From Swiss-Prot:
Pfam families: FliW. This is Flagellar assembly factor FliW. Disulfide bonds: none annotated. Transmembrane segments: none annotated. Keywords: Bacterial flagellum biogenesis, Chaperone, Cytoplasm, Translation regulation. Acts as an anti-CsrA protein, binds CsrA and prevents it from repressing translation of its target genes, one of which is flagellin. Binds to flagellin and participates in the assembly of the flagellum. The lineage of its organism: Bacteria, Bacillati, Bacillota, Clostridia, Eubacteriales. It is found in: Cytoplasm. The gene is fliW. Gene3D superfamilies: BH3618-like. It comes from Clostridium botulinum (strain Alaska E43 / Type E3). Signal peptide: none annotated. Belongs to the FliW family. Interacts with translational regulator CsrA and flagellin(s).
Length: 141
């Protein structure tokens, strides 16, 4: 299938790869269906594009690419809501805020996006009891 994004143009995806966020994503609670798109020219970044709004897309990244020590513990409620049967089915991403100065690019370690790739259910969770920041510099000096 092809989705036309105002910002990123034609985005090809398979229906089986559509990710459903039952509660939406913070700031986009009314949008539930997304596609995760590789940005080959900007690896390791990816685009989480809404399939319901051609202007709604988020740049995301696997936080472990930049923060080897980053860790979260999914609650039993999280794993139940996402129907996680196997930890290897969980993909963890964080949203990225871009800046023309690469030293000012930030990522949200406080509210990661969790995707169960076995059933394509996703959810953004908030880590209440952590010292992680909403705007954590991606490249620390």
């Amino acid at each position: 299938m092809i989705f036309v994004s105002k910002v990123h143009g034609n985005i090809e995806y398979e229906e089986k790869d559509k990710i459903t966020f039952k509660k939406g994503i913070l700031g986009f609670e009314n949008l539930k269906e997304y596609a995760l798109v590789d940005l080959k020219e900007c690896e390791p970044f990816k685009l989480l594009q809404s399939l319901e709004d051609d202007e709604a897309g988020l740049i995301v990244v696997c936080p472990f690419e930049f923060f080897k020590e980053y860790e979260i513990k999914l609650s039993d409620e999280d794993t139940t809501r996402l129907d996680v049967k196997n930890q290897s089915d969980v993909v963890l991403l964080t949203t990225v805020t871009l800046d023309s100065d690469p030293k000012k690019i930030t990522t949200n370690l406080k509210a990661p996006i969790i995707i169960n790739i076995s059933n394509n259910l996703g959810e953004q969770i908030i880590l209440d009891k952590s010292d992680y920041k909403i705007k954590h510099l991606l490249i620390e000096e």
